[in-house]
Amino acid sequence: MTDAQIALRALSDPADLEPLQPLYEHSDGPSCGFLQGLLDQSHCRAWCLVKDNQPVAAIWYQCVAERAAMVDLRVLASERRQGLGRQLLWASLTALGDVGAVELEVRSSNMAARALYKSLGFSETGLRPKYYATPDGREDAILMTLTLNHGGSAT
């Protein structure tokens, strides 16, 4: 058996979204229409992780001045628990270059994502009470921040 070929690919054109459709089916995150609009803006930075020529994960940021807000990080359901989210997040943090800090929000119940972010140096910096809708009501959003040096690594 051969090892899978994994590569980081920048997203820069609306045509780049078509292969990402399986990542966004049945999701409560941003729609492909929203992401296409975001990709059209100069402050968007986005990448996907490609495994054996198929996109298996994607990450999106809005960058203003020296700050980046992570809009979405998503891994194909069948590819989760293999370290691909960590690999994509780390590669994107390096590729952000001159960004001084990355901010994100995550559902309070998403313990796997929170653990991933903490393991890479993000710290919890705030709370948005009852921010997300759930089948049973509302759920808090945890705000997290990572300060980077200008080489893209955590400080």
Q: Residue ranges of each PLM-predicted region?
A:
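Conserved glycine-rich acetyl-CoA-binding loop
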Residues: 76-87, 107-115, 119-120
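Short secondary-structure boundary/hinge segments and terminal tails
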Residues: 97, 112, 134-135
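Conserved catalytic-core motifs of GNAT/GCN5-like acyltransferases
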Residues: 103-105, 118, 123-140
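Short hydrophobic/aromatic beta-strand or adjacent loop that forms the aromatic wall/cage
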Residues: 44, 139-143
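Acetyl-CoA-dependent GNAT
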Residues: 2-80, 86-91, 95, 130, ...
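Conserved GNAT acetyl-CoA-binding A-motif
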Residues: 96-108
